[in-house]
């Protein structure tokens, strides 16, 4: 599907809301109707051609008293789903009586196989039918979605044409709609509906197709020579509409095929939002990526695409995977997960993915993305190839959290166990609904020999191609050439302007408490049982882990020379990755000149004010008052005045 065809399809669906729902529904409700019916039509159109054969086979099964007719009907449809009602969306639209139309569409819903029923329930389609019937809009909506000028099927619409020589041939009239393009349309519609109503889905960012291809290539390219004829598993614990799963699957199979390997892949995912879960499940059913919906691990049945919170409702408990690729929510609170666990405090969490009995990887309640990383770490296989994790984060995962806190502990665990292969900074404005820069973490438990004990930081913030037209906030994309450049930086493993290779210890630091003698009101040192009483200072020092001479030497040199009474307190080991410290930002010459002009102008303005300010802040202009403590005598009535005065002394 080219851009012109994509834009035509998107505009048609977007305008259905304005043509059918306007004045009958609140704008905030448009997405609750348009998106589910778009997915339903995508399923419906695939079953049209086999409708008669399915009804005939169903009648055969009933006459032979076959209770489980699913295998027979899915064989007829060629998909892992079917519908046993007499209706399609095209035949439904012919009914003009609202009540009969309602009965017919409910019968149509009830005729679907169980997994489509799950999709209908997650979309709350039966409730929407009631609303549409009441507003007398259901018939018009069905008319639009069955229009001959749009195609929501994965298969192209063909038509017969007669050539100049009189021969006939079938040509494509409308292209098929693949899984990821469907996901792109779904997410762009959702974004536009939200923009129309000033709604933002905090922290939730659809991953652009060009970006996902890079994720897949980062997972497979460095180990492509180690791939064997085998089955590989791919997991996404924040799978949204399934775009990452399907694109990464394509990339792994493509690269393996280029290496002359015959591989099969199985995909696993989990999603919390009902609408995106339903869309993901529908598209994986349609595209043939999933031929059955559940698998057994031990004695427990699991859904390949699980519904619920990955954090507190693990849909793949105990399962390990070959590739874990995710783009989890950024800065999204996870307090609701405490309720699902039935606890009130995060200290009560005992899930072994996040707490090993000694060390906690549990972050602050305001941001869940590190929990997704810990979840993926727990999925790593102890196999010759191990597991490769490629996960997208914002900048906060690099450094937030104090030493000894959950975020720092997780970084410490990853780095000390030599799991961190690389972190790649991507360009700003690379996503549809956020301008922030993103960072790709590449984690593996099978590092190649040259990488052991090392971490590679890659600055790809300027490796991008500018878009002719912005898509939301997205103004650039990662082209094939850009992807190759980034992959070359990773695979070549060299120090240069865009790549820095560091020892693991570089990221460690000691957070050291400072203790000072307690003083009484007279300024005298407090003694307890003949010993000096020490109290913790409100400030602590961060000492590089690899500081020459260690903590004691740093403390002696940097603290005790200025404060001989201070002594060392508790030292806690933390880890952080100050990415910007290792790359210099190139500043444009014009930008520098403009900045110099602005600074010069500000200097002149400040200098013109100084005589007035310094005169006003003479000591005799400051009000003094008697201190309640006789030690101090007279003190300024307003401390901010005396502090500001010293700026001009």
Report residues per predicted region.
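Hydrophobic/aromatic-lined pockets within catalytic cores
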Residues: 21, 38-44, 48, 190, ...
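Conserved S-adenosyl-L-methionine
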Residues: 204-326, 331-336, 340-344, 394-396, ...
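Amphipathic alpha-helical segments that form coiled-coils or helix-hairpins used
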Residues: 611-649
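Hydrophobic C-terminal alpha-helix "anchor/cap" residues
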Residues: 145, 215, 413-414, 648
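Positions in alpha-helical segments
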Residues: 15, 232, 265-267, 626-630
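Structured loop/turn residues at beta-strand edges in well-structured enzyme cores
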Residues: 28, 180, 232, 262, ...
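A conserved structural/catalytic subdomain of Rossmann-like adenosyl-cofactor enzymes
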Residues: 4, 312-614, 618
